[in-house]
Structure formats: C-alpha cells, structure tokens
C-alpha cells in the first residue's frame, strides 16, 4: 500500500461523508508536526487536507521526531498541534495534560498534569502492540506464544546476536519502547535491534519474509503491513497494575514479573491529537478545535486502516 494512495482514498471518503465546511475568507495559519511513523503521517495528512481544502487554513508542516521534545515544542508554542499520540509510548502526557481522556463517552483516564498541552480529542484509532512472527515460521516451529521463543532462538539468531535470537525491535529510541529491558524481564533470550526508522524495520522484515526466513518483529496494530503479510502475534502478557508501580525508567523499571506490558500501563492505546492551549483558545481557531474534537477514524478490523467518519462542522 503506497502512502500517497492511502491518503488520497481516505481524503476522498472523508469529503464524501463530511459534507461542507464553512471556508474562511482569509487564510488562518497553524503549524503542525509531521510524525515519524506511517499511521501518524496518515492521520495528520488527512487533518491537514481538510483544514486547508475545506476550512481555509494554511498549515506549515515540520518533521519532528516523537518524544518529550515534541510535547515541549507544542507547550512552548513552537508547534501548534501533532496527531495520533499513543499514550503507552508518551511519557509527557501525565505531566502536561490536565483533563479527561474520553472514549465512547467513558473516561479512560483523568490526567492531573499542568495543562501546558491540550488534548484535542481521540482519533478513534485503538492501537495495540506485540511481537510478531510470520505464520509460516509459527506453523513450522510450533510457536504459539512468547514462551516458546527460547526453544527456537537459534532459528532467529544472526552473526551479530551470537547465541541469542534477534528481535527487529521498536525502531526509534524516542518512542520509549524499551524492548531489550522487556525481553530481559520476560526471560526471552533475544537481542533487540533498533534500526532507527519504521521504514528500515519494515524493509528488513519484508526482505526476510520474501526469503521465507523466521524473524521476530516489534509492530503495532493497526498497520498496513498486516494487510500484505500473514503474521502471528506471540501474545505478550497483558498489563496488570502492580501496587502503583509502572514499568518506567522513573522507578527503575519495577515490574510484576510478566505483567509489565505495555510500558506505561495501557492494555490498549486510545490514540489522541494534541495541541497548544493558547492557539486553540483563540476565537479564530474555534472551528479547528471543533474539527479535531469530532475527527474520528474507525478500526474496522484490528490490522488495517479504515474509513473516516466526521460530523459536519458548522
């Protein structure tokens, strides 16, 4: 699936569903962050397309890596908004949000931070993460869950990993995935390989798949990769609260044994858009704030991107 075709299809379906927006007489301006993974790029490109083509905005876009630095840039007003934050991998949301995260009318979490960043509503995309192997490898080796990986680690080993298996890991350090620590805590004798970008990790996995080699891949859902390649999750253990302790660097990685997934205590990621409070408090941007609050993707299935439903904003 090519990204440009995906964005075009999503934009077309969105416009057909949305109806008409009021267009501003003079262009209003916002500054958006370009995400460093495919899903975030798609979410923001669709938002930017609607804001510009239907609502009269001019949007400046800047490539900005995920992580605490992005949140700080938004709080400082250097950027106005960013799209599709995954709370399992955001360590600044607890510090900077001061409002409820609501999904389907239910409060998922009440944030008690300083309010220096605004939660602009959920995207509708519910994410999850796991480690995945090709179905052909799972069938051949009899791997059912993560507990079976060590028995077959030699099949996943490389010259670089020696006697350990290799995980094509979470690609970007700023995403706070902490794969190696998680592998070690679970007793999985694999070495996490951080390749720097989503594109590099996917290219590595695609090449191994085409060669019909076993490989273990960190990946999140929804993701287009699952629409092209038959993969099986190893069912990493669900998160469980551990006497107030969470699997974070701040408390030296305290854990409940196998119950430390994902990193900050979310069994599902209710993804959200976020922005600068002063920007979206301005009357001239009230329509943009309403747009983000109503913008919703829908997960048709757990592995692929979907259509958008957006109420008309008047």
Label each region the model flagged.
Residues 16-24:
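C-terminal segment of classical bacterial N-terminal signal peptides
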Residues 128-139, 269-284:
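A bilobed periplasmic-binding-protein/Venus flytrap-type ligand-binding module shared by bacterial periplasmic
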Residues 27-39, 59-62, 164-168:
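Short, well-ordered beta-strand elements
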Residues 39-57, 182-183:
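Short, polar/charged alpha-helical segment
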Residues 105-167:
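A conserved helix-loop-strand patch within extracytoplasmic ligand-binding domains
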Residues 306-312:
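Conserved small/polar residues in nucleotide/adenosyl-binding loops
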